[in-house]
């Protein structure tokens, strides 16, 4: 093989190798940091991964919010109009958090099927619902308004 060709081949192989390593590292980093959104029905049906950070959302079921007296732990249920998901959160809730309102949660599903939230986001005005929640808030295949009004909370 001609020395000039050999040098060019080595350079091309080196560039391909470095590019492959770069793409692999980027995909690995993205895979570790992506939090997929799951509605309560998919989580209850076991379609969401256990032990991995995910996002969930729905409407807070009225009458299910219980606060601990000696710490910041709060337990409540979230529904998409079909299934209810039990949630526990240890921290300060957003000011707009309320029963019957939309929330998006980030956290993990524990072995008992309880969603342990590390972050709670509440809606920011009276007509807003996060797009992920709005797409999943259905009952019998019929979409409700883009808020939690009109959802039947008796699952």
Curated annotation (Swiss-Prot):
It comes from Teredinibacter turnerae (strain ATCC 39867 / T7901). Residues 1-8 are cytoplasmic. GO terms for molecular function: heme binding; metal ion binding. It is a single-pass type II membrane protein. HAMAP family: CcmE (MF_01959). Heme binds at residues 124, 128. It is found in: Cell inner membrane. The gene is ccmE. One of its GO terms (biological process) is cytochrome complex assembly. The chain crosses the membrane at residues 9-29. This is Cytochrome c-type biogenesis protein CcmE. Residues 30-155 are periplasmic. Its main location: membrane.
